Amino acid sequence: MKILYYIYQICIALPILLVLTILTAIVTIIGSLLGGAHFWGYYPGKIWSQLICLFLLIPVKIHGREKLHGKTSYIFGPNHQGSFDIFLIYGFIGRNFKWMMKKSLRKLPFVGKACESAGHIFVDRSGPKKVLETIRQAKDSLKDGVSLVVFPEGARTFTGHMGYFKKGAFQLADDLQLAVVPVTIDGSFEILPRTGKWIHRHRMILTIHDPIPPKGKGMENIKATMAEAYAAVESALPEKYKGMIKNEDQDR
């Protein structure tokens, strides 16, 4: 069965998805320029992500979406198991949001320009002024019910285990007094681990935990929220992936 699936993904699924990716990028760029990034920066990417899971025959299960309220803006903090985290969140979290992503992703053909047009936020750590500009852009995006998705680990896992959480997302939530929503991704590591070359068919599960409202302001609130979010995300992982293992490139 694995051999048949590999043949299917190479000969049928991947060519279709390549065309879909280019078309989605073009639609996002043109739509964002003409009609605003609020709609065009989210819905084409959402449909694209759902189609990727559909064509690759990947089942998806969602828990906890009912915990999100109305047009409230949140900062989502998921673990980062692999590349398919993007499709799971974009396609199935059910909230209009902006990504906070590495600056290097801007260089990706079509996709980088589409992300820029959609208003997603590229993190530039080249100097204090660039960091402040990134924070300002993030603050500006969090309006009209739009949320922000940040991977607190900052890098995909090599092992399936979570690394430590960096404080950036939690500091932003503290500054804006927004709730942090811990999100657990399970199954993405089995589909395409960081060092993997082939896509493996496996179910993905997205678990949305209770929002963590601010309990004050300052470093004490930041540390408490980080600890609570980490425990929540880890709680929905399989036993084999529980326990922190630092990623070798997390400090970059």
What is the predicted function of each stretch?
Residues 4-7, 132-252:
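Non-catalytic C-terminal accessory region of glycerolipid acyltransferases
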